Each structure stands twice: as structure tokens, then as C-alpha cells.
């Protein structure tokens, strides 16, 4: 994980639960403590989880570290008349350039997770078969951005869109606009810190911000020594 330019090996907590008849006995808290102890013993200094109850995990020492922004845009609001010098090509999900692009993005983006093979397998595990990946290339054939999307019931669902520079950002929006005869609406996720409304001529769109991941330091001395 990139934490302000430093690469950290982090642990994950997932599927923490107890049977209803055993709730209120502190079992989950003990499981959590045991998990964090094992992470610390394996030389990890930071841990992440996706909370189902923010107040609960706050009481256990976790705090929100990132937000997830979602947006809904009408087809008439998609930026148009862009003429970036590069081009977009669709690729398979296991394309090496696609995955390498995410690694380059992670290296320059605070809070971004590096993905290994297992992470990529999990990334696409629940996606529908016609989910597509499109890469933006410069005029010199250098990949600088991508988007993962699905078109269903006249709606383009953008699972992820990242770009390394302004040209790739505009080039991908140009690609989205090229689907104007096929879609009535665009729904997407935005992991950047800036709302996208400022990018549109018609900024009257729906954007929502929700807490995404929670984290906590599990080895203060090791964390600071790596920082």
C-alpha cells in the first residue's frame, strides 16, 4: 500500500463474525486481537478492513482512511468534442499493460493498494462476463490510462477509471462519449479526491461520498521507522 509515497506491506481483516447465540461475549474482539497480533508477528505495521459498522470498529481502534465517490451523469452531460492525440483499445482483463498501469498509478497515489495476482483474481471474481477493459494510448503507443466498464440496460457502469495524466483523462472521456448512441446514463466510481462535476460543462450531476476503508497502525515503532 502507498502511504504518502512509502510502500507498506499491510494486513487485511475480513469475514469477522460470530453466530447470533454467541454475540455479546467478546469473541469477535478476541478474534480481532489475535489476528492483529499475528500480523504484527509477520512484520506488518498497518491493517485495513471494509467496515459494516463504523461505530463498532472505531471502538476497536480503527478509523476511516479513504472515501469512495460515486456519480451519475446523463448522456447529454458527458464531455464532448474532445480531440486527444492518442487512441483507445479494448484488451483482456489479464493484459499485462493494463495491470502494470495500475502499479504505476499505485506508486504515485497515496492510499492506493498494490495488486498481486490474487488481488486481480478477486477484483474480477464477481464481474459479469461482458465487463470490458479499455486502455488509452498516447500517439507513441504508450499506455497512460484505463477504464473497466459494463454496458447494461442503456447504462454504462464504470467500475474503475484511472489515468496518469490529463491527456489520458480526456481521452477516456472521449471514449465514453463515443458510446452516446448506446447509453442514456453513466454511473461510475471515482477514487480521486476531487469531484468530477468541475470537469463538465453541465455540472448538475449526482455525486455521493461515502466512507470506504478503515485502517489502524498495529506496530507503531515499525510504522514510523518505515515512514
Model region roles, listed by residue range:
Residues 22-34, 167-171:
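Conserved acetyl-CoA pyrophosphate-binding loop and the N-cap/start of the following alpha-helix
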Residues 1-19, 66-69, 75-78, 189-190, ...:
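Conserved acyl-donor/pantetheine-binding loop and adjacent beta-alpha core of acyl/acetyltransferases
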Residues 85-227:
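Intrinsically disordered, low-complexity, positively biased terminal segments
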Residues 22, 39-40, 176:
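Hydrophobic pocket-lining residues that define ligand/cofactor binding sites across diverse proteins
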Residues 77-85:
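Acidic/polar active-site rim loop that often engages polyanionic ligands
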Residues 47-48, 57, 161, 176:
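Conserved catalytic-core segments centered on acid/base and nucleophilic motifs
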Residues 41-45, 51-69, 171, 193-209:
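Conserved active-site alpha-helix within GNAT-family acetyltransferase domains
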Residues 32, 37-51, 181-191:
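Conserved GNAT acetyl-CoA-binding A-motif
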Amino acid at each position: 500500500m502507498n502511504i504518502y509515497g512509502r510502500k507498506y506491506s499491510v494486513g487485511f481483516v475480513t469475514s469477522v463474525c460470530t453466530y447470533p447465540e454467541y454475540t455479546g461475549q467478546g469473541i469477535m474482539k478476541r478474534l480481532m486481537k489475535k489476528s492483529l497480533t499475528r500480523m504484527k508477528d509477520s512484520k506488518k505495521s498497518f491493517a485495513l478492513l471494509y467496515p459494516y459498522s463504523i461505530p463498532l470498529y472505531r471502538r476497536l481502534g480503527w478509523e476511516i482512511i479513504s472515501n469512495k465517490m460515486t456519480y451519475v451523469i446523463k448522456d447529454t452531460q458527458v464531455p464532448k468534442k474532445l480531440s486527444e492525440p492518442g487512441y483507445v483499445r479494448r484488451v483482456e482483463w489479464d493484459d499485462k499493460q493494463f495491470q502494470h498501469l495500475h502499479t504505476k498509478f499505485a506508486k504515485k497515489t497515496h492510499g492506493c493498494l498494490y495488486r498481486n495476482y490474487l488481488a486481480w483474481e478477486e477484483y474480477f471474481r464477481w464481474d459479469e462476463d461482458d465487463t470490458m477493459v479499455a486502455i488509452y494510448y498516447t500517439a507513441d503507443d504508450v499506455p497512460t490510462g484505463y477504464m473497466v466498464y459494463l454496458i447494461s440496460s442503456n447504462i454504462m457502469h464504470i467500475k474503475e477509471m484511472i489515468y496518469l495524466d490529463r491527456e489520458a483523462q480526456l481521452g477516456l472521456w472521449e471514449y465514453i462519449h463515443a458510446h452516446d448512441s448506446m447509453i442514456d446514463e453513466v454511473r461510475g466510481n471515482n477514487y480521486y479526491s476531487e469531484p468530477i462535476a468541475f470537469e463538465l460543462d453541465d455540472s448538475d450531476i449526482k455525486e455521493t461520498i461515502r466512507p470506504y476503508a478503515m485502517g489502524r497502525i498495529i506496530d507503531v515503532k515499525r510504522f514510523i521507522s518505515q515512514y
